[in-house]
């Protein structure tokens, strides 16, 4: 199957392949969806380099991450070389238009993961991103509450805030910014937002860096780091839900499950793109950087943490599993709980720390347990891991 888009030929292979087994949606359904929401979807990635997150065997299997553009690609597919903090470089695909977008979808990309910079200026982000990440047990109403406070903080400091569901458990708040500041400065501004949100809503929001110390909704500012990407507006997530741009008037009553591959087609036809004016509303970071200066260093961690040696957790953590898949890791957790039933009964939802870790080309899952609710004499020690997958080819024991 081939599509002609603005004079470019996009070949679609295996259009009838089922990508979402639960709903039965195929690759062609995914292609058709992105064509309908093209204006909004392209706006979310236009002129940006992207990391290719490829589900070549469907969303029920693990994706692999591909920074480098495929060697075999149409001559019209553009690339740009990015440098990473590790010192490595990669020529990444730049999405310019719908043809580029659909070409990446044909590779097995379900969601789109752009960097916060444009290809013509890779050192100065034009987007500030806040990712609201709830700990287990936190309700959607609390996430919405934190999102509204994040909006207030951004707008009080001269930026227009743009909300969207994440397509998963969380929520995203974006702001277009003038591309005049470095990654470090943008991250510092985002951290200032997080700390101010936490100050206003200490019972609900947290900006604490270490996962085991968090409660409520983590206002994640680190998505503004140079090597981080976030699923873009209108991205279909592996859950089958969509990262849906919203108007702020919709946020209090929204539910993530309302925005699916099917329902978004009707929504887009009826309401268009709530983010249509985003590119014309770029603002300055000066006020947020002044806020960061006034806040001073974080009291809960040193300004310049040591680069050598392992951090000693302040919470009583034990590591349970490192697995290639989440299912394997969760099965290991259940075996551990069966061996320690009295301990398992005392655990709160937020005490089970499930981390999706990014390896060289794929994700893997780490599970740790915080024993803070277990009396000290009854806490089991660190045991051999239930699953001991080593994504890097070296031993890294301990929590």
Regions found by a protein language model. Give the residues of each.
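Signature for HUH/AEP ssDNA processing cores
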Residues: 94-166, 177-185, 303-307
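Acidic/polar low-complexity segments and flexible, solvent-exposed patches
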Residues: 296-399
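Short beta-strand
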Residues: 52-55, 161-167, 207-211
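A contiguous, low-structure linker/loop signature
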Residues: 61-115, 122
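A short linear hydrophobic-aromatic micro-motif
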Residues: 158-163, 204-206, 348-354
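A short beta-strand motif that forms the metal-chelation/ATP-contact edge
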Residues: 172-178, 217-221, 363-369
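C-terminal accessory nucleic-acid interaction domains of nucleic acid-metabolism proteins
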Residues: 1-27, 31, 42, 46, ...
């Amino acid at each position: 199957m081939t599509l002609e888009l603005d004079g470019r030929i996009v070949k679609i292979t295996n259009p009838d392949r089922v990508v979402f087994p639960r709903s039965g949606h195929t690759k062609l359904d995914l292609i058709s969806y992105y064509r309908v929401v093209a204006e909004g979807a392209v706006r979310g990635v236009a002129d940006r380099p992207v990391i290719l997150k490829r589900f070549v065997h469907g969303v029920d299997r693990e994706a692999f991450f591909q920074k480098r553009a495929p060697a075999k690609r149409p001559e019209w597919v553009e690339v740009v070389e990015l440098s990473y903090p590790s010192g490595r470089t990669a020529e990444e695909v730049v999405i310019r238009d719908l043809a580029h977008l659909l070409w990446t979808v044909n590779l097995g990309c379900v969601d789109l993961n752009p960097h916060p910079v444009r290809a013509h200026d890779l050192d100065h982000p034009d987007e500030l991103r806040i990712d609201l990440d709830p700990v287990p047990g936190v309700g959607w109403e609390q996430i919405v509450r934190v999102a509204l406070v994040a909006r207030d903080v951004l707008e009080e400091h001269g930026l227009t805030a743009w909300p969207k569901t994440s397509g998963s458990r969380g929520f995203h708040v974006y702001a277009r910014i003038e591309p005049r500041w470095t990654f470090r400065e943008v991250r510092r501004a985002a951290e200032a937002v997080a700390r101010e949100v936490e100050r206003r809503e200490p019972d609900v929001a947290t900006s604490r860096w270490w996962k085991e110390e968090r409660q409520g909704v983590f206002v994640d500012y680190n998505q503004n780091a140079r090597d981080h990407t976030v699923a873009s507006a209108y991205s279909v997530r592996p859950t089958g839900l969509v990262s849906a741009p919203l108007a702020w008037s919709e946020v209090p009553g929204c539910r993530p499950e309302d925005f699916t591959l099917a329902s978004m087609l009707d929504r887009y036809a009826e309401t268009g793109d709530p983010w249509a004016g985003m590119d014309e509303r770029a603002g300055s970071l000066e006020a947020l950087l002044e806020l960061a200066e006034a806040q001073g260093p974080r009291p809960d961690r040193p300004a310049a943490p040591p680069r050598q040696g392992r951090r000693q957790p302040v919470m009583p953590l034990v590591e349970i599993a490192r697995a290639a898949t989440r299912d394997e890791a969760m099965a290991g957790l259940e075996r551990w709980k069966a061996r320690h039933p009295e301990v398992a009964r005392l655990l709160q939802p937020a005490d089970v720390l499930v981390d999706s870790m990014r390896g060289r080309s794929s994700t893997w899952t780490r599970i740790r347990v915080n024993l803070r609710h277990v009396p000290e004499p009854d806490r089991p020690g660190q045991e051999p891991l239930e699953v001991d997958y080593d994504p890097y080819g070296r031993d890294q024991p301990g929590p």
